[in-house]
Structures are given as C-alpha cells and as structure tokens.
Amino acid sequence: VSAPTPSRVLTQNAVTGAWLSTALPVCQLEYGDELNGPGSLSGTLAPRLLSSNPALADPGNTFIYVESGGQLVWGGIVWDVRTQGSEYAIEAASWSSYLQRRYDLDGEFGGRGPYTYADRCHVLRDIWTYAQSIADGDLGVVVDSTTSTSTIGTPADVYHSYSYDVNCLGDKADDLVSGDATPDYTCTTAWNADKTAVVKRIRLGWPRLGRRRTDISFSSGVNIIEDPEIALGGDDYAQVVIASGAGDGSAKLRQISAVRNGRLRLEAAIDAPELNGNDTLKARAEAERGWRQVLGSVDQITIRNTTAAPFGSWQTGDDVYTRVHNQWGSFTGWCRVTGSTVKPEAQGGPQAVISLKPSSMYNYGGVS
C-alpha cells in the first residue's frame, strides 16, 4: 500500500482571499484532525523564505492548506511562527480555533438568543453565524444543517450569552459538545467541485460522528510500529457508579450500579440531567460501571500504512478494534479514534499517530 504524500502546501490571505503561495516548502510536516476540537498542523520553513516575504505565513491572518492526490486534506489558520535554531517553526489549527479569539460583544449572539429547549446544533450554528457576521470576521465556514434532540436551556434556567461575559465564543461552543449525549463535531476542508474555491466545514454528528468499523483494525505486529503505553490507572476505576438524572433536590432521579469484586471499594458519580426515566438512568449507570471496571487502556498508537488500515480509511469518531501485545502486557478491545496526526516525512516512511479512547466510555443520544 502506498501512502498518499502531500503534493503541496498552500497559503491564502484570510481577509482578501488572495493566494500567497501555492507550493510552500514546509519540512517536517505533521497535520491531523480532532474530535470536538480543531486539530493541528506543524512544520518548519527556511528563514530566508519568510524574511524575503513575511506575508507567506503571517500569524493570525493566513489560511494554510495541505493537498494530497489533488484533494485538500487539511486546512486551518496559522497562529504561530517563531525561530527554532536555523529554521522557522510554524503552527496552525483548524477552523474552530478561530472562535477562541472572538467574543459575544453584542449579547445573545447578536440577538439570536436567549434559548429554551434549544437544539445544541442550532445554537452552535448561531455562534458561527454571529461570529462571521462581523466585518473582517467571515472565514467562509459552513456548519452542517444536522439537528439533534440534545437541548440546552429550560424555562427555569434559560440559556443566555451576555455581552459582558468574559468567556470567548470558542468556550461557549465547546460547552455545547462537552457532555454525554451531546453532538460531535470536527473540522474538514475540501476543494469545491471545480477546484476554484475552498469549502471550510464544521461537520456535525448526531447521535455521533463515526461508526463501528469491521473492515479495518490496529494491531501489534501488523500496523502498530511502536510499543504503545498500556495505562493501568486507578483514578478512573470504580465498581460503584452513582448516576443522577432529571429533577432537583429530593425529587432528582438516582440510580446506583454496584458490584463487589474483591477489590477496594471505589465510587464514581455522573450527572445525566437529560435522562428522565429510572430504566434509562439505570442502564447508563451500568454502562459507566462497565468501562470503569476495566483496568488498562491504550491512549495513543503509531501506525504505518498497510491494508489493515490504509491511511485515510478511518474517520474521526470511528470505533476500531485494537490489539496491543508487548512485553509489558496486552490490550484488546474497541477504541474510538479521537484524533490523528499524519507524519508524511517520518523516518522510515509515512506514519500516523492515532489518539484513542475506550469505545465503552461514550454514550450517544442517552443510549450507551
């Protein structure tokens, strides 16, 4: 299997849209996507290049793209350029990072709020619409029209965004996707049909992004090329889970899932106010206990390009069966891809670093 290698790196003025470079010579290039985050890009440039034309990668004012096989595979904003020995180190993050530099100066996202029982996807779109409605603030980002049943705000606790709030728009957007049974998002970039313009997209998923993959796998001795750390952490371990659901005070629903297994009793509490039935709350508590009782997890692996999981075959949010066997121990199980970084110039050939979380940690739409 031949790994796709970047054919070129392009940069563009963020305000005027003028192309600054259609073949920027970036070395040590690394780039990738992230679940519910912007993902990142890093690399180095020759100092003489930037000294002769600083606008090629002007921090905070430049879009940067990676093209492979004639298709854009990553895009974002250059945020940092600094000297590093005899080179310039460049760092960028994808589209949602822009909201970390914007605030709700008008309140209620320019009059689009407040919100009661509002679809979180709708509020997320309102945040982007507001941010891009201000002069010099339009990235051209399109947010999916996905809808969900995950809501925010109640008559007793209306969701507001005040003009004096010091939390940036990025923090408000993150809050909408940070809980259990909330929508997912990731940033994507592509050419339009005739390759005359860039499509910048916030891809929304409900009840989730990604799917369980039976056609690819990550395995030691097959495509995992380094011995990953198998973490045995007691901080997350619990054989007793207390789940709180809808309601307030003494009327708040509560279910406990507990077993005795010869180990020191450890408890964990979770809050799931979106669950208003004891049966669903009990199922949620049992699912939570299920993954917390498993000692051992793999948070990151490095793979090479093989038929077992060709580069580009997985999507952010996918569940992939993972097998790790080394002298320290073994781990097998379904893991969710929460991010990946492609290193096309890695020593020995292209590599991808995959960030993982146990699939059993996640609950989608209130159902595990």
Predicted regions and their residues:
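Acidic, small/polar-enriched beta strand-loop surface segments
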Residues: 3-8, 113, 197-346, 360-368
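A broad structural signal for short, well-ordered beta-strand segments within beta-sheet-rich domains
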Residues: 22-28, 78, 155-160, 222-227, ...
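Beta-strand-rich assembly/attachment modules of structural machines
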Residues: 1-120
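Oligomerization/assembly interface segments of phage tail-like spikes and tubes
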Residues: 31-51, 86-98, 243, 293-308, ...
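A general structural signal for short secondary-structure junctions and capping/turn motifs
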Residues: 33, 81-82, 189-193, 231-235, ...
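Short beta-strand and beta-hairpin "edge-sheet" elements
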Residues: 65-93, 322-352
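A broad, structure-centric signal for solvent-exposed, well-ordered loop/edge residues
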Residues: 36-38, 52, 85-88, 99, ...
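Charged- and aromatic-enriched interaction segments used to assemble
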Residues: 93-232
